[in-house]
Amino acid sequence: MAETSIFPIMMLTVMIGVGRGVTDSPGRVSRCGERPAANTSVSYGLLSRIVGGTSAVKGESPWMVSLKRDGKHFCGGTIISDKYVLTAAHCVLEKNFEFQVSVSIGDHDFAVYERSEQRFAIKSVFKHPNFKPSRPFNYDLAILELVESITFDKDIQPACLPSPDDVFPTGTLCMALGWGRLQENGRLPSSLQKVVLPLIEYRRCLSIMETVDRRLAFETVVCAGFPEGGKDACQGDSGGPFLCQRSQGRWVLVGVTSWGLGCARKWADNILDPVESKGSPGVFTDIQRLLNWLSENLNQDKPDFPTYQVQCSTNDGIEKGTTGEILLPTGYKKYYSNNEKCIWTIIVPRGKHILLTFKSFNVECDYSCDLDYLVIYSALGRLIGKFCGDVSPRPLLIADASITLKFISDFHEYKTGFSLFYEAVEPDTYPDSDCGSVAVIFEEGEIQTMNHPHLYSSHANCQWVVHSPANYIIKITFLVFEVEPSEGCIFDRLVVYHDLQGTVVAGFFCGFALPDPVLSVSNVMQITFTSDYSANYLGFRAVISFVLPSSPVKPEKGNNQPRKNQDAMQHFDEGCGVSPLPPRFLYHNLIKAEEAMPNSWPWHVSINFGNKHVCNGAILSKTFVVTSANCVADREEFPSIGLIVAGLHDLESSINTQKRPVEYVIVHPDYNRLSKDYDVALIHVQRPFQYNSYVQPICLPDGHSRLEPSKLCVVSGWDLNVELSTKLQQLEVPVLMDDVCKKYYDGITDRMFCAGVIAEEDNASCLAQSGAPLVCQSAPGTYAIFGIVSRGVGCNETPKAGVYSSVFLFIPWIMETILSVAGIIDTDSEPHHPLFPPDKPSQQKALLPDSPPSSSSQDIYVTCKDVLSLQSPGEIKLVASGQDGPEGGRCQLIFQAPEGHFILLTFKQLSHEHYSLIIYEGASSNKTFKAQLMEEKIPTIMKSAGAVITLEASSTAQDSALHLWLSYSFHNQN
């Protein structure tokens, strides 16, 4: 089939109230864009590919379609309703297509029969009339109408079509799916593949395409991909879906796989490459641009479908005056139209506020109001509320003289619309609210934070006043609760009052624990929600009900604060690279950083000089921090003014932090101030860090870890965006190929690499977030530090990717430097984390570069009975018990390196009962005592003074037990 590729769009939504009586449309068991059979979480941390991708998990793409000719797959498609499938127009060109092709759904692996598989015949084909085979990259879209209706279940669901308001920013990670070739002209897979690609800015895509052929004109496309290639859709993926995820979790069909130059070719150097080597981003048909055509063809079989096809079926525009009414639809029309977009602006006299009262309301219901909805904005564009369902929203008092209402409908399911009155009222009718509204509630129902299920806004100051009938009290029951946690709820919080004056507190709440229900003491309750300028979360959703008091209610103050404020902190074992509070990405955008979950990067530290945040670093051990040399090179002679702050999220708050004075600074001896080569340094602190839920070390990469191009990693820091943020930010960045990096930067050495998106807007590390760690997943949930920010580009210039020092290449220097402090690393009273990530034994070598794994490396499993001489680097596991002999066990491990070398022992595991473990320098009669190993005080690494070292284990007890696992490597003394 034709070549391929990918691209897209997104939006921010809100809901103050969703109507009751949610019912599915006929034949719909679930809602579009949901995956009931799959884990709802999506990890982009370990990047996937179709060309360069991974196998999809069964159930995570229930809308996927395979078009088959003679039983063989040739194109993909997407289920969008119980009767319709979307595919590419270039897939349906053959004569009598509907009689030659079948639609297969519920299929995941072509090699095996699956109970979810279903085949459908095609009734009719609607190809976009503007599609031309001679110019197949425009209007490349077709609708397949099925003979029979699809019955939805957990394995088969439709994808959502985009709404006119959906916007997915440049850099957003989206997903393409298909059974296409795994490489250009390569084999076809049997199981469904997926690839995650970032959206490319439209103008940039056009400029790239001009390097292919200036005659190409792209009108209805979106583009996605990495400049260095390696990941794309390919032959056989055509017609398949390209989906982006809304912030509350739904998957939206943003594009249909259409076209591309080759498969996964790089296009960063297209101008320089010969014609036969040029590549392109993935090119997808832009569904949002073709919504009107889709609506006309998807609804023509509905007898009651409104035939008027205008942007808004009623007179929208500006409404002025002290009172008025807004109706949709109007006149003889019974239903509003599909694909409507109506906008009203209400303006009342200056100094007045606006009271909205809904007379009727019936809009297609959806839990997140993403299908059809009415949305209200303040004069400054702040989102006030988003509504859908069949229950009228409660009266809204907006503290402004101007508001904007927008109504959006999708391509199916039309209802009878709404009727509302607006009225200008005096400002003192109820207290003002910076939230933009005061909800006055006289009926039972639901309330929720602004923007829910999206993040609530900063500087919110929202208010609900609830009145119950006489003789009833008010009960608030929380369904969802996620508000920025803090000691005493000093940042963001929900407060419930027993009175309108706000003097009698019924409860205050923040964090992630679901509060207990709150009862009022009378028929009045006031609820307020406030937020500061950052760290926004999902907020809350709660049910208001009126109940009869069973007994006199005493005002009690409630809260949801757990002991020691560790409600979201998981139990964790001491180690490295694991956060007690796992990181969370809401937007999966490769260009614009977002605020991190507090303390989700617990190794990140602020390096202060003169009581001011200067740069960043990462904790390697309880006494060592790694950073960039350019951060500290001019300050290494003045360590006394340095301070390391760990456990820090907000630069303006010291909650949960540990402050450690700098003892000394060690800059790499080969650091060059001009070229920034060897840009790495270590800081030794005067007192050890205490590991807890907020402070943890990061792992070093192990000996088998390599950074592949396009691998997604994470950089964290306080100034990743244009303006300095006081809250820690995070940004996902893809690793770039060396030749791409060298194209944009001069002086790139073997000790540097680049990561980030080259785009026409702000980018990674643009303010030279010096010393910030770049961490990558070494295993699910475990991170290692692969890079240290060395330099970036000012945001006012054309953005480039950030330049990072390669930590892997500095491991020998890091270890040598730390070991030079003492023969044994950090042996204070607590056990220490390994400096390398936990993994399978075969991946635990973590050897220094001058002692690479080889055919002579040993992986040995022994019992404690004899003397074992080890003369090649490797690993050993020693297991013994008192049952090995009547007098316990005794053994020696003699590690012997070549002359002129020293030995590094890396301890990975030690547990013993009634065993003595002693390390000696030398062997036999020439050995001298070096250290005794204690289970509660195990070192991470031990360095020998000479070329021979002996480990002796002995026990005389029959109930003794020993488990020891270590690796050993040999290194030149010079």
Curated annotation (Swiss-Prot):
Instruction: Extract the ranges annotated as region (Disordered).
Output: 830-858
Q: Source taxonomy lineage?
A: Eukaryota, Metazoa, Chordata, Craniata, Vertebrata
Q: What is this protein called?
A: Ovochymase-2
Cellular component aspect of the GO annotation: extracellular region
EC identifiers of the protein: 3.4.21.120
Which Pfam families does the record cross-reference, listed alphabetically? CUB, Trypsin
Positions binding Ca(2+) in this chain are 112, 117
Where the record annotates domain CUB, the positions are 312-425, 435-547
Output the PTM entry: The catalytically inactive 107 kDa form is processed both N- and C-terminally to give rise to the 66 kDa catalytically active form and inactive forms of 82 kDa and 59 kDa.
Q: Tell me one GO molecular function of this protein.
A: metal ion binding
